[in-house]
């Protein structure tokens, strides 16, 4: 039959049936959902009205995520889908849709933070550093550079809930792009009240 976005196949408000006034038209068509899954990248192009293109992501495993309070964006790996307000089935099947809550790899953000502020983030006391990390955090710097980093460090506060996540190496994020339409998986790191809310929801779901 084909998926149609018309309204004349529905009954009237009174409950009476409508007579079809015409056959289905091309401009009323609908397409099946992409149901983007977590996996090695696979994107199909779809020709749309006007000769335009949509990018139908069938599988994705990376995306650009922004850290709002620090005004920085990094490309990182998506690890898992943990919550979806609309449907638990989408969590079970690891389907990536807009507004899904996912866990992402925290490493690119930690590397940026430690390079920008010269402060450790989410590290246990006395944890061994690699040579590269040692060089970033304990490098000998000029007085001018030291003053620059000291000035930055005044604003280097990270909320405790987020710091705990950095210690585990995974951060909760929300997807804000539409992977079935634009073929990308972009979003933002959860912070503040929003992070508290979703952590409560995930906890209550696990308790069931």
Curated annotation (Swiss-Prot):
It comes from the Eukaryota. Pfam families: Ribosomal_S8e. Keywords: Ribonucleoprotein, Ribosomal protein. Residues 1-33 are annotated as: Disordered. GO terms for biological process: translation. InterPro entries: Ribosomal_eS8 (IPR001047), Ribosomal_eS8_CS (IPR018283), Ribosomal_protein_eS8_euk (IPR042563), Ribosomal_Se8/biogenesis_NSA2 (IPR022309). The keyword Transcription regulation does not apply. The keyword Ribosomal protein applies. Residues 7-26 have a biased composition (Basic residues). GO terms for cellular component: ribonucleoprotein complex; ribosome. One of its GO terms (molecular function) is structural constituent of ribosome. PANTHER family: 40S RIBOSOMAL PROTEIN S8 (PTHR10394). Belongs to the eukaryotic ribosomal protein eS8 family. NCBIfam families: eS8. This is Small ribosomal subunit protein eS8.
């Amino acid at each position: 039959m084909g998926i149609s976005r018309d309204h004349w196949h529905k009954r009237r408000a009174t409950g009476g049936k409508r007579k079809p006034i015409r056959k289905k038209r091309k401009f009323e068509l609908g397409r099946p959902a992409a149901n983007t899954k977590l996996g090695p990248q696979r994107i199909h192009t779809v020709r749309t009205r006007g000769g335009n293109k949509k990018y139908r992501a069938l599988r994705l495993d990376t995306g650009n995520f922004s850290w709002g309070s620090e005004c920085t964006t990094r490309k990182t790996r998506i690890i898992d889908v943990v919550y979806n307000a609309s449907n638990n089935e989408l969590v079970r099947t690891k389907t990536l849709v807009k507004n899904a809550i996912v866990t992402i790899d925290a490493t690119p953000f930690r590397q940026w933070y430690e390079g920008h502020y010269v402060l450790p983030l989410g590290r246990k006391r006395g944890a061994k550093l690699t040579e590269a990390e040692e060089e970033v955090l304990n490098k000998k710097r000029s007085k001018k550079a030291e003053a620059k980093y000291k000035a930055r460090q005044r604003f280097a506060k990270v909320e405790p809930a987020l710091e705990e996540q950095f210690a585990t190496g995974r951060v909760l994020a929300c997807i804000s792009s539409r992977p079935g339409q634009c073929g990308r998986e972009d979003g933002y790191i959860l912070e503040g009240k929003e992070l508290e809310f979703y952590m409560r929801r995930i906890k209550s779901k696990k308790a069931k």
